[in-house]
């Protein structure tokens, strides 16, 4: 009995650690979302979906960029759609629908997209650069070509990111 309790505790602790690491990623792939309190993190930069429905990019504790959507909903999340649009939705669970309250307006063809919080603090939507917060420090102009079950390398030297995708 002691063995199964210990095994269960180790398993639960592993799950807790894994879920913590997942919420500290620096990127979102299509279909992934940040719920209230979830964030992307890269060094001293953090993009957080706040409880008040405002999506804010912080440099340490100083806000650098925001969607200015505070109090425009009650249960918001942000997601990267398969068409390349980065959208904040207010979730109306009882009505079975979501209402868009902000979008990057980068929708196009379905494809391979990734949104990355770079090492320089710039939040960039890649397939080719089509949306950025304008907070870049090193002038990156990378292009991503993500393929099924492959690694993608992108970013200028100061911002090199490697993401393994299962698109």
UniProtKB/Swiss-Prot annotation:
It is found in: Secreted. SMART domains: B_lectin. Keywords: Antimicrobial, Disulfide bond, Fungicide, Hemagglutinin, Lectin, Mannose-binding, Plant defense, Secreted, Signal. It comes from the Eukaryota. Residues 25-138 form the Bulb-type lectin domain. Disulfide bonds join 53-76. One of its GO terms (biological process) is defense response to fungus. GO terms for cellular component: extracellular region. InterPro entries: Bulb-type_lectin_dom (IPR001480), Bulb-type_lectin_dom_sf (IPR036426). Coiled coil: none annotated. Expressed in the pseudobulb, with highest levels of expression in the non-swollen internode (at protein level). Mannose-specific lectin. Shows agglutinating activity towards chicken erythrocytes. Has antifungal activity against A.alternata and Collectotrichum species. This is Mannose-specific lectin. It comes from Dendrobium findlayanum (Findlay's orchid). The gene is dfa.
């Amino acid at each position: 009995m002691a063995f199964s309790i210990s095994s269960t505790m180790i398993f639960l602790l592993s799950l807790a650690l894994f879920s913590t690491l997942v919420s500290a990623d620096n990127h979102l792939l299509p279909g992934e979302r940040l719920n209230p309190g979830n964030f992307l993190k890269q060094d001293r930069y953090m993009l957080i979906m706040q409880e008040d429905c405002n999506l804010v990019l912080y440099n340490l504790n100083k806000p650098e960029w925001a969607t200015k959507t505070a109090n425009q909903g009650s249960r918001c999340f942000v997601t990267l759609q398969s068409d390349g649009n980065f959208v904040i939705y207010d979730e109306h669970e009882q009505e079975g629908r979501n209402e868009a309250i902000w979008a990057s307006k980068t929708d196009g063809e379905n494809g391979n997209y990734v949104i990355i919080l770079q090492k320089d603090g710039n939040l960039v939507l890649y397939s080719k650069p089509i949306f950025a917060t304008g907070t870049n420090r090193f002038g990156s102009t990378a292009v991503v070509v993500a393929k099924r079950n492959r690694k993608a390398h992108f970013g200028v030297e100061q911002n090199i990111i490697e993401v393994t995708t299962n698109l």
